[in-house]
From Swiss-Prot:
One GO CC term, this protein: acetyl-CoA carboxylase complex
Protein's name according to its UniProt entry: Acetyl-coenzyme A carboxylase carboxyl transferase subunit alpha
Gene this chain is encoded by: accA
Species in which this protein is naturally found: Cupriavidus metallidurans (strain ATCC 43123 / DSM 2839 / NBRC 102507 / CH34)
SUPFAM superfamilies: ClpP/crotonase (SSF52096)
EC annotation from Swiss-Prot or TrEMBL: 2.1.3.15
InterPro entries named among the record's database cross-references: Acetyl_CoA_COase_a_su, ClpP/crotonase-like_dom_sf, COA_CT_C
Pathway: Lipid metabolism; malonyl-CoA biosynthesis; malonyl-CoA from acetyl-CoA: step 1/1
EC class of the enzyme, as a word: transferase
Limits of the CoA carboxyltransferase C-terminal domain: 39-293
PANTHER family to which the protein is assigned, alphabetical: ACETYL-COENZYME A CARBOXYLASE CARBOXYL TRANSFERASE SUBUNIT ALPHA (PTHR42853), ACETYL-COENZYME A CARBOXYLASE CARBOXYL TRANSFERASE SUBUNIT ALPHA, CHLOROPLASTIC (PTHR42853:SF3)
GO molecular function annotation: acetyl-CoA carboxylase activity; ATP binding; carboxyl- or carbamoyltransferase activity
Localization per record: Cytoplasm
UniProt keyword Nucleus, yes or no: no
Length: 323
């Protein structure tokens, strides 16, 4: 698949186009231009490093939404084996914006749950662009409770603009469904490892992300509202989204500094979409490291650790002027 370049990546796109042009010419030319191709490839790589070393929060938000970025099912195929998808909330419907099921991780049985956005127009509509309704969160809760019953660790993958804000979702208890999930996750007797792989949008993300370990991919985002939504409220125009992204502090490094996430998983040069298999390999290694720390831990210890972790959010110390 041909790489889609974002606006700020246009200098890279121009170099890559030139490289492709030379490769096409080389196939029909007696002149060896491989040295020039190698030189331009090196220049493109260095330019990518320079651009990605100085990204603004708004540019990170664009990468998190990249249409070719790996989604939950892409990681399921690369990281897990024997995946068996489970459907429905046993109350209303099967929300396809959330996928989940039983699988094996390095041979160990587990439960996998995550948002799924869709690649083309038809699938995006089918998946509701990754915006879940109450039945989606209730499906996730059902799978968490099933994993808890059989002592299976849970892996969740977050990638949503936010919970679906439609009238039908509100009528069926959107806030109750999200709140009930928070309650269930807080009391699980098994470890839950949450990974924000793309967009982490508000309560729609939090509904499957109250984990014993919360990690983010390097160019993922996690915030209470989208930059455009924030800008529309504060400045009455979505054009202020770059300023809003800066104010929201939605990047992995900012959230790690605040203690809101535990780990940052590095992405391949140019983002996860440039090397999906490489990204899956790095993520699998990180998940294995996270799961390992819970081996031999009793349920009481696990729940006490989780409680302490959750109660630490928002803590601060007041320091007055010395007399």
């Amino acid at each position: 698949m041909k790489t889609t370049f974002l606006d700020f990546e246009q200098p890279i796109a121009e170099l890559e186009a030139k490289i492709e042009e030379l490769r096409f010419v080389q196939d029909d030319s007696a002149v060896d231009i491989s040295e020039e191709i190698s030189r331009l490839a090196g220049k493109s790589q260095q330019l990518t490093k320079d651009i990605y070393a100085n990204l603004t929060p708004w540019q990170v938000a664009q990468i998190a939404r990249h249409p070719q970025r790996p989604y939950t099912l892409d990681y399921v195929r690369e990281i897990f084996t024997d995946f068996h998808e489970l459907h429905g909330d046993r109350a209303f419907a099967d929300d396809l914006s959330i996928v989940g099921g039983l699988a094996r991780f390095n041979g160990q049985a587990c439960m996998v749950i995550g948002h799924q956005k869709g690649r083309d127009t038809k699938e995006r509509a089918l998946r509701n662009f990754g915006m879940s309704k109450p039945e989606g969160y209730r499906k996730a809760k059902r799978l968490m409770e099933l994993a808890d019953k059989f002592g299976l660790p849970i892996f969740t993958f977050v990638d949503t603009p936010g919970a679906f804000p439609g009238i039908d979702a509100e009528e069926r208890g959107q806030s109750e469904a999200i709140g009930h999930n928070l309650y269930v996750m807080a009391g699980l007797k098994v470890p839950l490892i949450a990974t924000i792989i793309g967009e982490g949008g508000s309560g729609g993300a939090l509904a499957i992300a109250v984990g014993d370990v919360v990690q983010m991919l390097q160019f993922a985002t996690y915030a209470v509202i989208s930059p455009e939504g924030c800008a529309s409220i504060l400045w009455k125009t979505a054009e202020k989204a770059p300023e809003a992204a800066e104010a929201l502090g939605l990047t992995a490094h900012r959230l790690k500094a605040l203690g809101l996430i535990d780990k940052i998983v590095s992405e391949p040069l140019g983002g996860a979409h440039r090397d999906a298999k490489g990204m899956a390999t790095m993520l699998k290694r990180s998940l294995a490291e996270s799961l390992r720390q819970f081996q031999g831990m009793s349920v009481k210890e696990l729940q006490a650790r989780r409680h302490e972790r959750l109660m630490a959010y928002g803590k601060f110390k007041e320091t007055g002027a010395q007399e």
